């Protein structure tokens, strides 16, 4: 049980334990999402990102930094060592296939590592590791990272599905964003 990080020692030609007992930091101030897809996001994702961008004066009461490396493995490593949350949510373009990332060879291995390191990994509506694959190419939404950020995202999705969430709003654009739909 647990997660340990190893680094290749090129001189010795072997991997050396450099990060024993990795634990994802509980508190975070970073999130990673491809903001160019904002116009396609579901309301729970818009709500979460809006709250993060509101900073100290917003409902999350701290300033967040947004990251996007566009490399799933690099993002997973950053979350493991620095904390934070990574979001590749289902959106208007990927809804019919269940998301964009491959469940079996992308989401499942990383979800297992994240949970072993004390974090969470969800689709937005449920735990990644609870999904029984229907086929080898199955796609999924994928949100992982510090539990303190994953849990509100799951709650927002459940509230949205139940019709009990608050509407997305922006002081400048009301229920729209900067990007046109």
Tell me the role of every PLM-derived stretch.
Residues 1-181:
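IMPase-like, lithium-sensitive Mg2+-dependent phosphomonoesterase catalytic core
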């Amino acid at each position: 049980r647990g997660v340990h990080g190893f680094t290749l020692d090129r001189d010795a030609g072997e991997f050396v334990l450099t990060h024993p007992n990795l634990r994802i930091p509980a508190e975070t101030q970073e999130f990673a999402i491809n903001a160019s897809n904002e116009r396609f996001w579901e309301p729970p994702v818009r709500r979460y990102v809006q709250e993060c961008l509101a900073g100290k004066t917003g409902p999350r009461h701290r300033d967040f930094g947004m990251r996007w490396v566009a490399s799933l493995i690099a993002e997973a490593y950053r979350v493991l060592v620095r904390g934070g949350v990574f979001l590749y949510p289902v959106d208007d373009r990927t809804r019919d296939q269940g998301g964009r990332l491959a469940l079996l060879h992308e989401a499942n291995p990383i979800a297992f590592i994240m949970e072993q390191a004390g974090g969470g990994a969800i689709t937005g509506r449920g735990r990644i590791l609870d999904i029984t694959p229907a086929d080898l190419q199955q796609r999924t939404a994928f949100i992982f990272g510090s539990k303190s950020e994953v849990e509100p995202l799951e709650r927002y999705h459940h509230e949205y599905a139940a019709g009990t969430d608050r509407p997305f709003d922006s002081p400048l654009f009301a229920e729209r964003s900067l990007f046109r739909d």
